Swiss-Prot record:
It comes from Nitratidesulfovibrio vulgaris (strain DP4). Its EC number is 2.1.3.2. One of its GO terms (molecular function) is amino acid binding. Pfam families: OTCace (PF00185), OTCace_N (PF02729). Heterododecamer (2C3:3R2) of six catalytic PyrB chains organized as two trimers (C3), and six regulatory PyrI chains organized as three dimers (R2). InterPro entries: Asp/Orn_carbamoyltranf_P-bd, Asp/Orn_carbamoylTrfase, Asp/Orn_carbamoylTrfase_sf, Asp_carbamoyltransf, Asp_carbamoyltransf_Asp/Orn-bd. This is Aspartate carbamoyltransferase catalytic subunit.
Length: 317
């Protein structure tokens, strides 16, 4: 497996999903499936990355993604080290580059970064010799979330993505999850619909390869899957929403609205959820929900990413 991966994986970094060819994407998902199977065993730890080191550099708050990467690294037997902005010299005014160079002097094999500035991951990848994984940069991209979402859908759909319809619902304007999912899923032939109030749609969305809706009933009709995005409550405080109750009335995914989708439609949510605001509790806990599947897929997918980057052929880009 390792020798095969060395010959097939050319990328030093994972910055966004559009850097992957279809063959590379399928190889990554197939690798994740192998690790998913390992994660179901009584003993989940394998020696695959023993002796490798992974630094988790989260300059923005995170619970799910950071924990998922930490678990992924440990299950591969890598040494993982965590650094948050509150515990780093960034808080004292040190530049991102100097902090990263200090970390690289420790000779890690992979640096996983989350940062509030769009482009931060690429900035580091262009300057550091170790592999860099973008765990979310501003509103720009969240490739590992899109990959685990794709993996979760593949568990249901198989490889028949072409012609499927996915509705992404919620705060699209400020969502790196939506941006990466649009890139990835449309490249596989999925028809993507975006649904949000006009104040939560991004500028230039008319140029995206998507259909845009402000009416949720129309957006979910005959959809194969619906992805709800967390509504950040500060959007209402910023005046982008008139009233949270009105938002819930118009944009909460309820049983009645899900009935408008296809009978076998699945529901996704990257978390954390605002139950009763963007998704009804009965939907979040329903058999159609893939929310917990996404959590399991996240560990397996991130194991695959760490494995591929840490064992790649030198000289890849």
């Amino acid at each position: 497996m390792q020798n095969e991966t060395r010959s097939l994986w050319p990328h030093k970094d994972l910055l966004d999903v559009d850097q992957l060819s279809k063959d590379e994407l399928l190889h990554l998902l197939d690798t994740a499936a192998q690790f998913h199977e390992i994660n179901r065993r009584p003993v989940k730890k394998v020696p695959t990355l023993k002796g490798k080191s992974v630094i988790l550099f989260f300059a923005e708050p995170s619970t799910r993604t950071k924990t998922s990467f930490d678990v992924a690294g440990k299950r591969l037997s890598a040494d993982t080290f965590s650094l948050a902005k509150s515990g780093s010299s960034l808080q004292k005014g040190e530049s991102l580059k100097d902090t990263a160079l200090t970390l690289e002097a420790m000779n890690p094999d992979v640096l996983v970064i989350r940062h509030s500035s769009s482009g931060a991951a690429r900035f580091l990848a262009d300057r550091l010799a170790c592999g860099v994984v973008n765990a979310g940069d501003g509103w720009h991209a969240h490739p590992t979330q899109a990959l685990l979402d794709c993996y979760s859908l593949r568990q249901v759909w198989g490889d028949t993505f072409e012609g499927r319809t996915l509705c992404i619902l919620g705060d699209i304007a400020h969502s790196r999850v939506a941006r990466s999912n649009v890139k990835l899923l449309t490249s596989l032939g999925v028809r993507v619909r975006l649904c949000a109030p006009r104040t939560l749609l991004p500028a230039g969305v008319g140029n995206w390869p998507v259909e845009v809706f402000t009416d949720l009933d129309a957006a979910v009709r005959d959809a194969d899957a619906v992805m709800c995005l967390r509504l950040q409550l500060e959007r209402q405080q910023a005046g982008l929403l008139p009233d949270l109750r009105e938002y819930s009335n118009r944009y909460c995914l309820t049983p009645r609205r899900l009935e408008l989708a296809k009978p076998e439609a699945r529901v996704l949510h990257p978390g954390p959820m605002n139950r009763g605001l963007e998704i009804a509790s009965s939907i979040a806990d329903a058999p159609a929900s893939l929310v917990l599947d996404q959590v399991a897929a996240g560990v397996a997918t991130r194991m695959a990413i760490l494995f591929l980057l840490a064992t790649r052929t030198d000289g890849g880009r």
